[in-house]
């Protein structure tokens, strides 16, 4: 089976040995959970409960809003508390609702009966279940999964790609899921394929996950109605990028401004497939996820099942806290390449919290923002083949008109350019700011036209 190699990228130290291969762990029940209302790209859902309402685990607490939106459900049985502002994982304060836990009695809401005969269930019903259970992407922008499974009629999709690459250093939550829940992931993938009306499923996993590869290959047999191929990928960052993975597995290129569906593919992470399986076959909304808690300062790094809304402080305490001789320099939600540094221990876990990473002071890179040396490393290793050096200068000088022409919106924010830069320029931060400014300008222009 041919594997295509994308241009650019590099090979950072992975540090996955800190958490890989350990048993899954759970967080003890907490007295309170704080559920952020807007957890995905698009609009926030609308709160549909009030203070004092009794809820069960999985009870709807915020209904789907307009546009790209998904509902939210209670992570535990208990009572609805206050609507509050809490630190958000991407900086700033965000709106959230408190759930005060019933410490004596926990049970699932039974609003969604299991669909055991999903093969004979209409596509409309399956898609509605995925939507009503709030399934999203389990990293990045947490894109609503039901939207991914609804390509326009004019888009001809023939292949579903399951993303098990997990190329981000330190993170092993997908690896753990594939080792221990391979069959559930692939059945969830088969449900997605049925919704899309296709039979071809291709799974991409990097070769540094041999146990996951073996488990997924063994589980791929005997699932009727689909043809599943598991492919071994070379270790290279960012192999798990949607466009890079698609090219590696199929040889199809997604041009700037296009989507995977434009070349006949839909890409879904293995964690989302597991959530689809849980929603359809068990009737469980997405209210918890497996997250890698890791880093050299952490006493007991590993992969933990965390309820949505659990505070960072409780997660770290359950992982044994910080080693006595360590000085934590940074706490990151996600991985070291694409994650976001946190400034508060009160920030809650969200649906896209793939990792919680602690770095020692000695491990934190310092970006000086010095002048570009014109060495060309960033251009050579950019997986999107962008003119990084000139693009960074344009963004730094707030020439967003030039940045737009140089395709800043195509930037993955993967961090390769900043990592290889000998001048330690904060390129990614420049690009993030530019993209935010351009988005706001576009929004203002649309409002003017109304």
Language-model segments: which ranges?
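N-terminal, Lys/Arg-enriched amphipathic/low-complexity engagement segments
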Residues: 1-48, 98
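Short histidine-centered loop motifs in beta-beta connectors
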Residues: 45-54, 58
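Short hydrophobic beta/alpha edge segments that flank linear recognition/processing sites
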Residues: 55-69, 84-87, 94-101
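Conserved hydrophobic positions within beta-strands
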Residues: 78-80
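Hydrophobic alpha-helical hairpins/lids featuring a short glycine-rich hinge
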Residues: 91, 98-162
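Gly-rich Lys/Arg/Thr-decorated short loops/hinges at beta-loop-alpha junctions or inter-strand turns
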Residues: 107-108, 160-174, 297
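Hydrophobic alpha-helical positions that pack around
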Residues: 198-312, 318-323, 335
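Ferredoxin-type iron-sulfur electron-transfer modules in oxidoreductases and energy-metabolism complexes
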Residues: 353-369, 379, 383-450
């Amino acid at each position: 089976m041919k594997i295509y190699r994308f241009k650019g990228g590099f090979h950072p130290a992975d540090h996955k040995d800190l958490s890989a291969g350990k048993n899954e762990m759970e967080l003890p029940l907490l007295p309170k959970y704080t559920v952020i209302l807007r957890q995905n790209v698009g609009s926030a859902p609308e709160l549909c409960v009030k203070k004092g309402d009794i809820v069960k685990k999985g009870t709807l607490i915020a209904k789907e809003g307009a546009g790209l939106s998904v509902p939210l459900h209670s992570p535990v049985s208990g009572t609805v508390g206050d609507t509050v502002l809490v630190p958000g994982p991407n900086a700033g304060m965000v709106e959230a609702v408190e759930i005060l836990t019933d410490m004596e009695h926990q049970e699932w809401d039974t609003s969604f009966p299991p669909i055991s005969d999903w093969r004979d269930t209409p596509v409309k019903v399956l898609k509605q279940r995925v939507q009503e259970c709030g399934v999203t992407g389990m990293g990045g922008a947490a894109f609503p999964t039901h939207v991914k499974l609804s390509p326009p009629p004019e888009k001809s999709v023939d292949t579903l790609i399951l993303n098990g690459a997990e190329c981000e250093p330190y993170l092993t939550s997908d690896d753990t899921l594939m080792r221990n829940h391979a069959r559930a992931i692939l059945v969830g993938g088969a449900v997605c394929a049925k919704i899309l009306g296709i039979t071809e499923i291709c799974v991409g996993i990097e070769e540094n996950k041999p146990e996951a590869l073996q488990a997924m290959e063994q589980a791929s047999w005997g699932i009727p109605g689909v043809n599943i191929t598991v492919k071994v990928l070379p270790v290279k960052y960012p192999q798990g990028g949607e466009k890079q993975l698609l090219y590696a597995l199929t040889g199809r290129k997604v041009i700037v401004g296009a989507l995977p569906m434009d070349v006949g593919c839909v890409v879904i992470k293995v964690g989302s497939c597991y959530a689809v399986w849980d929603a359809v076959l068990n009737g469980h909304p997405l209210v918890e996820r497996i997250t890698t808690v890791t880093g050299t300062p952490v006493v007991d790094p590993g992969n933990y099942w965390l309820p949505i809304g659990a505070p960072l402080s409780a997660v770290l305490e359950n992982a044994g806290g910080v080693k006595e001789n360590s000085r934590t320099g940074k706490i990151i939600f996600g991985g070291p390449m694409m994650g976001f540094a946190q400034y508060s221990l009160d920030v809650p876990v969200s649906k896209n919290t793939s990792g919680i990473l602690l770095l020692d002071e000695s491990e934190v890179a310092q970006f000086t923002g010095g002048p570009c040396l014109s060495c060309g490393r960033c251009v050579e290793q950019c997986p999107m083949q962008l003119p990084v050096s000139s693009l960074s200068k344009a963004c730094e000088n707030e020439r967003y008109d030039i940045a737009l022409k140089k395709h800043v919106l195509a930037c993955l924010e993967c961090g390769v350019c900043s990592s290889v830069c000998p001048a330690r320029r904060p390129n990614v931060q420049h690009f993030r700011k530019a993209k935010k400014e351009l988005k706001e300008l576009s929004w203002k222009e649309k409002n003017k036209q109304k």
